[in-house]
């Protein structure tokens, strides 16, 4: 079986444009607008994002996560802090988020610094999760090598027995807010002359710039 001819795969982007006059006063307000439109158009996992981090050896790593909140100071997500991403953020809190909204021919890139959320916020979110997800957090020592799926299923069954009622928040379960320094909004256009409008934080506030595609 031959390889798919990836070089021949092309799409023409012609859904919409993005002008400077379309921008909100700040990137959080602009993101809220685009996220709402993405949710209306996509529904399924419109809040999915790629989180990229860098370890002490300067090797990058990326993974898909779900955005769980947008605050005045940034973008909120939750995860196991003992995972690879947790260790890398502890060593270097600078990170990047990418929201790929293919049906809208849009993407948003966020570069910023991750800061841990208060424990009360973490526990409040964990308490809102479905019981199955709570038990899964106890069963999985994220990013560690396991002997097979049976080991995970046994750990899950043990967690069910251990916590027949309320499931407490694991100590290593945490959350972060990514405080943005740069937020770029990308809209596909015809002829590959895409619109790229960037918010950049300065001591005097946010400035907006158009970038060549």
Swiss-Prot record:
It catalyses: pyridoxamine 5'-phosphate + O2 + H2O = pyridoxal 5'-phosphate + H2O2 + NH4(+); pyridoxine 5'-phosphate + O2 = pyridoxal 5'-phosphate + H2O2. Keywords: Flavoprotein, FMN, Oxidoreductase, Pyridoxine biosynthesis. Pathway: Cofactor metabolism; pyridoxal 5'-phosphate salvage; pyridoxal 5'-phosphate from pyridoxamine 5'-phosphate: step 1/1; Cofactor metabolism; pyridoxal 5'-phosphate salvage; pyridoxal 5'-phosphate from pyridoxine 5'-phosphate: step 1/1. GO terms for biological process: pyridoxine biosynthetic process. Disulfide bonds: none annotated. GO terms for molecular function: FMN binding; pyridoxamine phosphate oxidase activity. Its cofactor is FMN. Binds 1 FMN per subunit. Substrate binds at residues 10-13, 68, 125, 129, 133, 192-194. Its EC number is 1.4.3.5. The keyword NADP does not apply. FMN binds at residues 63-68, 78-79, 85, 107, 142-143, 186, 196. Catalyzes the oxidation of either pyridoxine 5'-phosphate (PNP) or pyridoxamine 5'-phosphate (PMP) into pyridoxal 5'-phosphate (PLP). Belongs to the pyridoxamine 5'-phosphate oxidase family. Homodimer. This is Pyridoxine/pyridoxamine 5'-phosphate oxidase. It comes from Nocardioides sp. (strain ATCC BAA-499 / JS614).
């Amino acid at each position: 079986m031959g390889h798919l001819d990836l070089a021949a795969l092309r799409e023409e982007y012609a859904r919409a444009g993005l002008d400077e006059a379309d921008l909100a006063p700040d990137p959080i307000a602009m993101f809220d607008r685009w996220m709402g439109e993405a949710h209306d158009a996509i529904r399924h996992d419109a809040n999915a994002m790629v989180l990229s981090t860098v370890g002490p050896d300067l090797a990058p790593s990326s993974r898909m996560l779900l955005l769980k909140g947008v605050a005045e100071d940034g973008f909120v997500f939750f995860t196991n802090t003992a995972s690879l991403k947790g260790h890398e953020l502890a060593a270097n809190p600078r990170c990047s988020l990418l929201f790929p909204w293919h049906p809208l021919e849009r993407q948003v890139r966020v570069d910023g610094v991750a800061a841990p959320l208060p424990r009360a916020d973490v526990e409040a979110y964990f308490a809102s999760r479905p019981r199955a997800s709570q038990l899964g957090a106890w069963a999985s020592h994220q990013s560690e090598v396991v002997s097979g799926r049976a080991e995970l299923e046994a750990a899950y069954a043990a967690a069910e027995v251990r916590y027949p009622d309320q499931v407490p928040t694991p100590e290593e379960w945490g959350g972060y807010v990514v405080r943005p320094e740069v937020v770029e909004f990308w809209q596909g256009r015809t002829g590959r002359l895409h619109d790229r409008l960037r918010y950049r934080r300065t001591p005097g506030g946010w400035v907006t710039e158009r970038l060549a595609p």
